[in-house]
Design a protein with these regions (language model features):
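Interaction-mediating elements
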Residues: 1-144, 148-149
């Protein structure tokens, strides 16, 4: 399997995080569903490591079969970010949580104590954005019936 990652910061992060989790292995039968599952896994790894705007459409594969052989060479391509209304590609931005604040509704009062809210918040200041932590926070808040978000 070959990798064509056009963003050096993601390439470095992938080398540290991802090789331990590789699902696609040399000698596996070619399967489009497995390639799509790999795209989703890589997307999950990156959105849990600061890349808020990353989605699976940045990842594509090319498959090259050798005539007479029963082998397929796979290349994974990870493209740069293209902002809306732009023709220029840029590097993907990695986001870090700056601060976590709780604000009340129309009257400005919080429906619960800050301690209760903090105990149910998985997002932490100074850590990279993590979509799993965001979902866990939403789920925890959903169980607190006094909260609407």
């Amino acid at each position: 399997m070959a990798y064509d990652i056009k963003d050096d910061s993601i390439a470095a992060k992938m080398e540290r995080i991802y090789p331990k989790r590789m699902w696609l292995k040399k000698g596996m039968p070619f399967n489009v569903a497995q390639l799509d599952a790999e795209r989703k896994r890589i997307t999950s790894v990156l959105t849990d490591n600061g890349y808020f705007h990353f989605h699976k459409d940045f990842i594509s594969f090319t498959a090259d079969s050798v005539k007479g052989e029963k082998l397929v060479n796979i290349a994974l391509h990870l493209d740069k970010f293209r902002p809306a209304n732009s023709t220029c590609d840029t590097l993907h931005t990695s986001y870090t949580i700056g601060s976590v604040n709780f604000t009340g509704g129309n009257n400005g009062k919080l429906p619960l104590r800050k301690g209760t809210l903090a105990e149910n918040t998985w997002i932490e200041e100074g850590k990279p954005f993590c979509s799993t932590d965001l979902k866990r926070t939403y789920n925890s808040f959903g169980k607190l019936q006094a909260i609407r978000y």
